[in-house]
């Protein structure tokens, strides 16, 4: 029986191009779809990033289309088979994606031609897939986040996309805080469609990619069940459509790659888990905190992530100071970057408590792995978290999550007092975060209980296997219907 082909359309895919968690999803889920007999194909833009320069990419297709008063040209490149565990294509659109950053210019702001970039990418994908010469025949098109949100509408309602009109579309909201919203003056960037349909791509006076996708995709999901419920109160189009067609929506937890995230085989760790968990923690902690005192006999609480309001990073410094004042017997390590004000506060915290606090401003993948391996707790005070992967990485490496109950954290971190494997708290406040870290330290003092919870946490299966089965079930329903 011929394998069914699902096309994943995304602006990110690890290891090619990564700005956030969407890249990990698009780079991991297809491996598991393939294990279950599917033929996953990934297509992204071609950026001027180091990864692309190192690859064996072959030009596979060239095309063009009219856009406003100009002609947009594009070329599709295919990665040599076997270099990734799935078929990978990237689209080169001269002047649009040949830049050193995926979304932000040198000033840290979004590109001025964001509308042209996103819409030209989507139209290139449609033009390519519509041509039998592409050699790719999809059974389903899976669109990821707002940068691809117009595709479900365009394949159903335009001459340009009519060859794909019978193919079901699936749309995933990775982070509802971001959207492609353009003024009506940009309508000519889209191919022509019946004017009576204009109302269906509009929301609040703008052309709205997320609202369009919610209306026209055959299925819409988010990256955790709880985040779907939370988004209903944040995205008016979602609430409106869910009240009319609730069966069209679902929440599916993201997963992690257990081969990449394995403390026994992790190539990024110099001290892997080869003997006892206690010994593995001890040697990693000693290496990570070589400049601090009291390395091995007191707990380590760490933070890994963006210094952003969403992540609750502004709560960290005052909460850490309170915990140090009240408990003393604890070390902290903070790894991240972002808001310059928070960066400065973290560095000041490190300087003030040089014997207790370590930090690294920036991001280093190998260091992140070592922080997980060294830590006893990972703190996640997020104000919202569509899914969250850090708590999964942490448990895999023997660190319990101290997490605020929002989004995917609510689905994966249950408080230890309720029989769970983490420390949960409810409010995005310094008081609640401080109290949660205090509870974690009391748990750590109960050595027998802590080690049993840690042992159970390390056995948790957060692999993509279960999530892939849920995706496949929905894929099959859409194709059959």
PLM regions and their residue ranges:
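Catalytic cores of nucleotide-sugar-dependent glycosyltransferases that transfer UDP/GDP/TDP-activated
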Residues: 1-481
């Amino acid at each position: 029986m011929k394998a069914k082909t699902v096309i994943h359309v995304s602006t990110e895919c690890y290891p090619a191009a990564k700005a956030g968690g969407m890249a990990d999803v698009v780079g991991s889920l297809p491996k598991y779809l393939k294990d279950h007999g599917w033929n996953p194909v990934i297509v992204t833009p071609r950026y001027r990033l180091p990864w692309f320069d190192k690859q064996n990419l072959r030009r596979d297709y060239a095309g063009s289309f009219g856009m406003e008063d100009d002609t947009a040209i594009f070329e599709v490149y295919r990665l040599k088979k076997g270099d990734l565990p799935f078929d990978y294509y990237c689209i080169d659109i001269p002047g649009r994606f040949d830049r050193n950053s995926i979304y932000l210019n040198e000033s840290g702001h979004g590109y001025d031609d964001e509308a042209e970039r996103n819409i030209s990418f989507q139209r290139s994908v449609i033009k390519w897939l519509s041509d039998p010469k592409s050699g790719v025949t999809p059974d389903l098109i899976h669109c990821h986040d707002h940068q691809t949100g117009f595709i479900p509408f365009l394949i159903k309602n335009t001459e340009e996309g009519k060859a794909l009109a019978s193919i079901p579309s699936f749309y995933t909201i990775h982070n509802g805080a971001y959207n492609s919203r353009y003024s009506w003056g940009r309508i000519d960037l889209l191919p022509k469609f019946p004017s009576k349909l204009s109302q269906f791509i509009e929301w609040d006076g703008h052309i709205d990619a997320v609202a369009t996708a919610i209306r026209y995709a055959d299925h819409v999901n988010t990256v955790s069940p709880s985040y779907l419920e939370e988004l209903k109160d944040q995205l008016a189009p979602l609430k409106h459509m869910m009240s009319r067609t609730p069966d069209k929506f679902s929440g599916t937890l993201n997963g992690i790659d257990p081969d990449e995230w394995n403390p026994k085989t992790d190539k990024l760790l110099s001290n892997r888990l080869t003997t006892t968990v206690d010994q593995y923690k001890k040697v990693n902690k000693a290496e990570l905190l070589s400049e601090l005192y009291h390395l091995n006999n007191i707990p380590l609480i760490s933070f890994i992530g963006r210094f952003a309001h969403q992540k609750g990073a502004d709560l960290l410094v005052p909460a850490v100071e309170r915990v140090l004042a009240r408990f003393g017997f604890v070390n902290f390590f903070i790894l991240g970057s972002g808001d310059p004000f928070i960066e400065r506060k973290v560095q000041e915290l490190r300087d003030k408590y040089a014997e207790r606090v370590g930090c690294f401003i920036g991001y280093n993948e190998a260091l992140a792995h070592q922080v997980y391996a060294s830590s006893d707790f990972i703190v996640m005070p997020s104000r919202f978290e569509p899914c969250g992967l850090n708590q999964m990485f942490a448990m895999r490496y023997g660190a319990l999550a101290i997490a605020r109950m929002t989004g995917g954290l609510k689905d994966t971190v249950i408080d230890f007092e309720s029989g769970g494997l983490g420390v949960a708290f409810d409010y995005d406040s310094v008081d609640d975060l401080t109290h949660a870290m205090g509870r974690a330290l009391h748990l750590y003092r109960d050595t027998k209980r802590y080690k049993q919870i840690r042992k159970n946490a390390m056995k948790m299966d957060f692999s993509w296997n279960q999530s892939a089965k849920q995706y496949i079930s929905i894929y099959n329903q859409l194709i059959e219907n």
